[in-house]
């Protein structure tokens, strides 16, 4: 092997390493997204379990059970309007459609 072949081989190896590094970075970013989503889902699941346990312990249902249930869902940070039902509210910001539903008689 002469010097040019060695240099070319090292250059190819360097390019392969850069490509591999870019792939590893992409995988790390994807994994971070999956971890964040998993954390969010675990938190939501925990809140839902706590509310379910609380409802099981109370055992009674009032005549306004449906409205109370919607209020609890909204207070837990979820939409109750027909446009975004069940989706998490960003930073628990109020939704005018959800609030309108809660204020109906």
Swiss-Prot record:
Its cofactor is Zn(2+). Keywords: Cytoplasm, DNA replication, DNA replication inhibitor, Metal-binding, Zinc. GO terms for biological process: DNA replication. It is found in: Cytoplasm, Nucleoid. It comes from the Bacteria. Involved in control of chromosome replication initiation. Inhibits the cooperative binding of DnaA to the oriC region, thus negatively regulating initiation of chromosome replication. Inhibits the ability of DnaA-ATP to form a helix on DNA; does not disassemble preformed DnaA-DNA helices. Decreases the residence time of DnaA on the chromosome at its binding sites (oriC, replication forks and promoter-binding sites). Tethers DnaA to the replication machinery via the DNA polymerase beta sliding clamp subunit (dnaN). This is Replication initiation control protein YabA. It comes from Streptococcus suis (strain 05ZYH33). The lineage of its organism: Bacteria, Bacillati, Bacillota, Bacilli, Lactobacillales.
